[in-house]
Amino acid sequence: MKKLLTLTTGLVAIVLAGMIGVPAQAYEAGPVTGGGTIDGKVVFNDAVPTRKIIPNKDVEVCGGIREEPLIAVGPDKGVQNAVVYLVEVAKGKAWPAAGKTPELDNRKCRFEPEVQVIRAGPLDVVNDDPILHNTHGYYGKRTAFNMALPNQGQRIPTELTRVGTVRIDCDAHGWMEGWIYVVDNPYYAITGADGKFSITDVPPGSYTLVAIQSFTGPIQQPVTVTAGKPTNLTIELKKQ
């Protein structure tokens, strides 16, 4: 069954709360019997807006004046780096195998990765550049962390323990921008260059699915997963 989702203005309270950070909910990992898959594509059908970046310092590292899109859209309208996730999932598949601590890297006056999803917990902030960066994360208007990194190769650990959207700025380079989405369950995906995503091993049942991109903001939609079957979605983002 294929559904077309469009942006709504009456977003559920949990989505709005997630923008400012809420405590992580308990999640029980275990075997999933008869899990289904949510396969989909995120699209943007309007004209792609851009912003003009004018570096006013450290141009030898940061580069020159340039135009950059506010949303990455491919020739078939697929949106890259949109985040899709399920909310209020109390039980299901295991988290991905633990590796190194997630990183937010200041590299050539950009945040790498620009968009990432992490489990509530530790984060390392890194400076790869030979210049000062001041990396500042916000849940809404509330500071999540604020750290000066004057030295190349510097690494500072921090914790993001609340679920929600964290906007990342650099107080030394005002055009830098990144996004971290902190989640409390492993049912999430980031769209590829073609706008497609897949969320696997979802226990049968009804859920709220959220898709979000920094320019358009979030969209939420009920979704029902049937045992052993795929649910196919096309999600259309629009500027709020």
Please report, for each region that a protein language model flagged, where it lies by residue.
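N-terminal signal peptide c-region/cleavage motif recognized by signal peptidases
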Residues: 21-23
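Bacterial N-terminal signal peptides
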Residues: 9-19
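Hydrophobic alpha-helical segments and their boundary regions
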Residues: 6-10, 29
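Extracytoplasmic copper-binding redox domains, predominantly the cupredoxin/blue-copper superfamily
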Residues: 25-240
